[in-house]
From Swiss-Prot:
Its cofactor is pyridoxal 5'-phosphate. One of its GO terms (molecular function) is 4-aminobutyrate:2-oxoglutarate transaminase activity. GO terms for cellular component: 4-aminobutyrate transaminase complex; mitochondrion. Gene3D superfamilies: Aspartate Aminotransferase, domain 1, Type I PLP-dependent aspartate aminotransferase-like (Major domain). Substrate binds at R216. Pyridoxal 5'-phosphate binds at G160, S161, T374. It comes from Dictyostelium discoideum (Social amoeba). The modification N6-(pyridoxal phosphate)lysine is found at K350. Belongs to the class-III pyridoxal-phosphate-dependent aminotransferase family. It is an enzyme of class 2 (transferase). Keywords: Aminotransferase, Pyridoxal phosphate, Transferase. This is 4-aminobutyrate aminotransferase. Its EC number is 2.6.1.19. It catalyses: 4-aminobutanoate + 2-oxoglutarate = succinate semialdehyde + L-glutamate.
Length: 495
């Protein structure tokens, strides 16, 4: 069906989708989002004429080429995003996995009208120098309410990239502090660092994994290896990259083979730590390689990584920028691993609204101003996090994620069974799921088509579609998606 004919059918309510039985939709302890739309509404092409006009206007000022459409955030509700042309889409992409409790959440709106929020918005402080009087209490009531086990310190930052960048700095400073036995800096170190020379500027490295993504600042980009276009023309550090396990699915049918794959990857990590020509001070790993294609490893692999880092005195950074804040059914994805000792550093951003990293006192620099910037985060985002955490607890959103994720996964298997070889490698935890298509072109075709049916989605890796719904996404929303996904497959693959 052509896109113009599709829009015509949609607008005349003649477009019939396969109905996944509503009687089989599971219930969750989470209440419905107040004032939410009942279902997607598509009136125009996407992007529509008003979005196209704004894209053309923006093009005169900055690069708009990545824009899907222009959003009308005032008109968006809960799990549904509105565009400027009046289309209402079920949002399963959620600002690249960064919206936790819905558009225009009433509790956030209520909080934003308070004097605390107004003061934080109009009097933005340099938190490291002149923190507001309620900053310690705000940290206790937000960040420390969800701190990973074993980590009692938090460094606040502005985004996921700078959270990881500052985590690398913390690792390097810790490594050198241990190396010099806690002694003061030498005059030679102090003078040589001003020339970018050793010993003050030591030659150290961070080990990362192929297909990983950790940001686009200079240090993080040297550890990002998901897409060439991110790295082209940018100088990079000569840091090692290990192979991340490429598991075979279904996992239960390939347990022996996958264990061998993970063992080989662990051996490679240890060999790189022992032999890389630049000493490895730390490693960074995502619980799920999100941007790189939703690549998974089992708890066995991560337990092995922790053992290796402890054995060799190498810091372990877990990048929970995309996986944190409950999307896998646990607040932190690394909770699924059952580690014998916690990671040294856990970084966060996206759904947390705020950004930064958790650590313990060993990773606090020996002097002030060493890991520092003007803002050191934003109190408004901490205030937002405080509300979000309250909503997660009050509305049982982690339980909701597990129930909703299971329903989504079952529905994907149901549809995949009717299209052998097309929908591949259904995988994930909670609602943090992904599927593969045979080629990038097939994946992109599906995303474009289902958008015309009122579902906003995103890809990752070479040929994957990633599911990144909000924590307030319920089985009823997934039922709407499954109907439209099934119809998309029919339209594209069954004449």
């Amino acid at each position: 069906m052509s896109s113009s004919r599709l829009i015509k059918c949609l607008s005349s309510n003649n477009y019939i989708v396969r109905s996944f039985s509503k009687s089989s939709i599971p219930t969750t302890p989470t209440p419905d989002f107040p004032g939410e739309y009942k279902e997607p509404i598509v009136k125009t092409q996407i992007p529509g004429p008003q979005s196209k006009a704004l894209i053309e206007r923006l093009n005169k000022l900055q690069d708009p080429r990545a824009a899907h459409f222009f959003a009308d955030y005032a008109n968006s509700r809960g799990n549904y995003i509105s565009d400027v042309d009046g289309n209402i889409l079920l949002d399963l992409y959620c600002q690249i996995a960064s919206i936790p409790i819905g558009y225009n959440n009433p509790e956030l709106i209520k909080a934003a009208k308070s004097d605390r929020w107004v003061s934080a918005i109009i009097n933005r402080p340099s938190l490291g120098v002149l923190p507001p009087k309620d900053w310690p209490a705000l940290i206790e009531n937000s960040f420390m309410q969800v701190s990973p086990k074993g980590l009692n310190q938090v460094f606040t930052a502005m985004c996921g990239s700078c959270a990881n960048e500052c985590a690398y700095k913390a690792v390097f400073m810790h490594y050198q502090h241990v190396k010099r036995g806690g002694k003061p800096f030498t005059p030679e170190e102090l003078s040589s660092c001003m020339k970018n020379q050793e010993p003050g500027s030591p030659s150290l490295s961070i080990l990362s994994f192929k297909k990983g993504f950790h940001g686009r600042t200079f240090g993080t980009l040297s550890t990002t290896r998901s897409k060439a276009i991110h790295k082209l023309d940018i100088p990079a550090f000569d840091w090692p990259a290990a192979t991340f396990p490429d598991l075979k699915y279904p996992l239960a049918e390939h347990a022996k083979e996958n264990r061998e794959i993970e063992d080989r990857c662990l051996q490679e990590v240890e060999q790189l730590i022992k032999t890389w020509h630049i000493p490895v001070a730390g490693i960074i790993v995502e619980p799920i390689q999100a941007e790189g294609g939703d690549n998974y490893a089992t708890p066995y692999f991560f337990q092995g990584l922790r053992d290796i880092t402890k054995k060799h005195g190498v810091s372990m950074i877990v990048d929970e920028v995309q996986t944190g804040m409950g999307a896998t059914g646990k607040f932190w994805a690394h909770e699924h691993w059952n580690l014998t000792s916690p990671p040294d550093i856990v970084t966060f951003s996206k759904k947390m609204q705020a950004a930064g990293f958790y650590h313990n006192l060993d990773y606090r620099p020996s002097e002030s101003y060493r890991n520092f910037n003007t803002w050191m985060g934003d109190p408004v985002r901490a205030l937002e996090l405080e509300v979000v955490i309250g909503e997660i607890k009050k509305n049982h959103l982690l339980d909701n994620v597990v129930i909703t994720g299971n329903y989504l996964k079952d529905g994907l298997f149901d549809i995949a069974a009717r299209y052998p070889g097309l929908i591949q490698n259904i995988r994930g935890e909670g609602t943090f799921l992904a599927i593969d298509f045979p080629t990038p072109a097939e994946r992109d075709r599906v995303i474009s088509h289902i958008r015309l049916l009122g579902v906003e989605m995103g890809g990752c890796g070479e040929r994957s579609i990633r599911f990144r719904p909000m924590l307030v996404c319920q089985p009823s929303h997934i039922n709407q998606f499954l109907n439209r996904f099934d119809q998309t497959m029919k339209e594209l693959y069954k004449n």
